[in-house]
């Protein structure tokens, strides 16, 4: 379907080369000050055309808020917003309108719906992720009210791994690299892929932490069975174009360890390690929430590739257009937005966990 979330619900619409894309964010509490500078900055972080390491397609990505905001504050009603597509070049896709691009959604969309929007992939395009970033900015405004911060960066490009994590450096980096020392090597790997008309995969690190030093995240976000925090995070991120795996905490490495090596021991001050990635039993345990999202190489490459057309005839696919050589770079920003949306949803869900919370609200009235 086209909706993410339960209490804070984002519904998106629009296609890559349509007039507009947009969303409706329902469930946002009233009285939250709308930070227009934050919204603009989040959109710029995802925006293309900023350097040679991302797509040359540079949309303005101005968010037009159509409802749910009055005199600078959320009203509690659905926040509707539009983002205009102004830099689409549909002619770049004329030569492939009847064939399936390898490892794209063309094949499955055509067989499911029987109708295919070949212009930039239509609804399956990562262009839709701009909506998630806009909605994530609103979620960040909510989380800021209770001292929760989400941030992200790149920890791996083409197998070249970061050795240090510096989220402040990532904000300044052209590729959002977390490790300044490894950044140039990672950039070279991307440039080599571009020279070879190829693409390259990568891994993003996303985390949530308390806005205040020496303070913890809220304990108990999420529910133990059918609204597990880690499950909702994984669902949101694996639903993003190009993400093939999501790890929480130690993730895959956990399967290689013994219990004595993995367990997070405790003392009176709290946990002595964070191999669980901030989630136990489907709920936040107060520690930083740590996620890794693994992105496949961009399937849009400029090498001749064998494929078939809509009549099942073999043919050659030679792409044109403007594409990211490494989707992990801009994808890291989208994952950060998705984590913000999931956490905001879980914050609202948590209001139902204790009768004391409801009494506090209604006894004040």
UniProtKB/Swiss-Prot annotation:
* Entry superkingdom: Bacteria
Q: Which pathway?
A: Metabolic intermediate biosynthesis; chorismate biosynthesis; chorismate from D-erythrose 4-phosphate and phosphoenolpyruvate: step 7/7
What is the cofactor note? Reduced FMN (FMNH(2)).
Q: Which GO terms describe its molecular function?
A: chorismate synthase activity; FMN binding
Per the record, the GO terms for biological process are: amino acid biosynthetic process; aromatic amino acid family biosynthetic process; chorismate biosynthetic process
Q: What is its EC number?
A: 4.2.3.5
Q: Where does FMN bind?
A: 123-125, 241-242, 281, 296-300, 322
Top enzyme class of this protein?
A: lyase
InterPro entries with a match to the protein in the record: Chorismate_synth (IPR000453), Chorismate_synth_AroC_sf (IPR035904), Chorismate_synthase_CS (IPR020541)
Q: What keywords appear on the UniProt entry?
A: Amino-acid biosynthesis, Aromatic amino acid biosynthesis, FAD, Flavoprotein, FMN, Lyase, NADP
Q: Which cellular component terms (GO) are annotated to the entry?
A: cytosol
Q: Which reaction does it catalyse?
A: 5-O-(1-carboxyvinyl)-3-phosphoshikimate = chorismate + phosphate
- What are its cofactors? FMNH2
Coiled coil ranges (UniProt) are: none
Task: Quote the record's binding site residues for NADP(+).
Answer: 46
Describe the family membership recorded for this protein in Swiss-Prot or TrEMBL.
Answer: Belongs to the chorismate synthase family.
How is the quaternary structure described? Homotetramer.
Biological role stated in the UniProt entry: This reaction introduces a second double bond into the aromatic ring system.
Which HAMAP family does UniProt cross-reference here?
Answer: Chorismate_synth
Protein name, as recorded: Chorismate synthase
The taxonomy runs: Bacteria, Pseudomonadati, Campylobacterota, Epsilonproteobacteria, Campylobacterales
């Amino acid at each position: 379907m086209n909706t993410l979330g339960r209490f804070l619900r984002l519904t998106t619409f629009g296609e890559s080369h349509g007039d507009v894309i947009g969303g409706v964010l329902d469930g946002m509490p009233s009285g939250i000050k709308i930070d227009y500078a934050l919204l603009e900055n989040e959109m710029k972080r995802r925006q293309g055309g900023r350097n040679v390491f991302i797509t040359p397609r540079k949309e303005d990505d101005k968010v037009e808020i159509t409802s749910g905001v009055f005199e600078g504050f959320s009203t509690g009603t659905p926040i509707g917003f539009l983002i205009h597509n102004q830099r689409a070049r549909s002619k770049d896709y004329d030569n492939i309108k009847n064939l399936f691009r390898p490892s794209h959604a063309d094949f499955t969309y055509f067989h499911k719906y029987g109708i295919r929007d070949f212009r930039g992939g239509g609804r399956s395009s990562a262009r839709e992720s701009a909506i998630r970033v806009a909605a994530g900015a609103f979620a960040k405004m909510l989380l800021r009210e209770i001292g929760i911060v989400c941030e992200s960066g790149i920890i791996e490009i083409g197998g070249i791994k970061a050795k240090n994590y510096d989220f402040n450096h990532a904000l300044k980096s052209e590729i959002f690299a977390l490790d300044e020392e490894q950044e140039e090597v990672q950039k070279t790997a991307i440039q080599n892929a571009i020279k070879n008309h190829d693409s390259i995969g990568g891994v993003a690190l996303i985390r949530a932490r308390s806005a205040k030093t020496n303070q913890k995240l809220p304990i108990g976000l999420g529910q133990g069975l059918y609204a597990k925090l880690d499950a909702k995070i994984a669902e949101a991120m694996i639903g993003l174009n190009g993400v093939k795996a999501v790890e929480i905490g130690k993730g895959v490495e956990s399967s290689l360890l013994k219990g004595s090596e993995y367990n997070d021991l405790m003392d009176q001050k709290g946990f002595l390690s964070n191999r669980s990635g901030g989630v136990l039993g489907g709920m936040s345990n107060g520690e930083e929430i740590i996620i890794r999202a693994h992105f496949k190489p961009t399937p849009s490459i400029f090498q001749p590739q064998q494929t078939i057309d809509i009549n099942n005839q073999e043919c050659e696919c030679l792409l044109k257009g403007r594409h990211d050589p490494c989707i992990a770079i801009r994808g890291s920003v989208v994952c950060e937005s998705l984590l913000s949306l999931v956490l905001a949803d879980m914050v609202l869900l948590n209001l139902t966990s204790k009768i004391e919370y409801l009494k506090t609200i209604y006894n004040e009235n």
